[in-house]
Amino acid sequence: MQNIPPQVQAMLGQLESYQQQLQLVIQQKQKVQADLNEAKKALEEIEALPDDAQVYKTVGTLIVKTTKEKALQELKEKVETLEVRLNALNRQEQKINEKVKELTQKIQAALRPPTAG
């Protein structure tokens, strides 16, 4: 087996780093997506309640009473924040994927035997 040039070893190390970053971003995306789905479901449930319904929310380890209007406002803000975060993570994932693809091509080109011309 031939030795891998130091330059290619460095690129392989960078590729591994990108792949770890990608895994982290994917995990974060899954968490944000789950939180977003939960917030949207809660929003639907509260919107379906009558205006005079008693609404409670959790604050740390406590459950406190709030108004439907205030709960709706807080949930809408939460959904908006989570959507922004999810979009940012999608862009980050796309950029890392592009870097992985580009670096993989460079590694393959560096390891390809020279062609006789």
UniProtKB/Swiss-Prot annotation:
Record's subunit section: Heterohexamer of two alpha and four beta subunits.
Protein name: Prefoldin subunit beta
Cited InterPro entries: PFD_beta-like, PfdB, Prefoldin
Predominant location: cytoplasm
CDD domains in the record: Prefoldin_beta_GimC
Function: Molecular chaperone capable of stabilizing a range of proteins. Seems to fulfill an ATP-independent, HSP70-like function in archaeal de novo protein folding.
GO function terms (MF aspect): protein folding chaperone; unfolded protein binding
Top-rank taxon, per record: Archaea
Cellular localization per UniProt: Cytoplasm
Underlying gene: pfdB
Family: Belongs to the prefoldin subunit beta family.
Coiled-coil annotated residue ranges, if any: none
One Pfam family per UniProt: Prefoldin_2
Record lineage: Archaea, Methanobacteriati, Methanobacteriota, Thermococci, Thermococcales
NCBIfam families the UniProt entry points to: gimC_beta
GO CC aspect terms: cytoplasm; prefoldin complex
Keywords: Chaperone, Cytoplasm
Keyword Cytoplasm tagged: yes
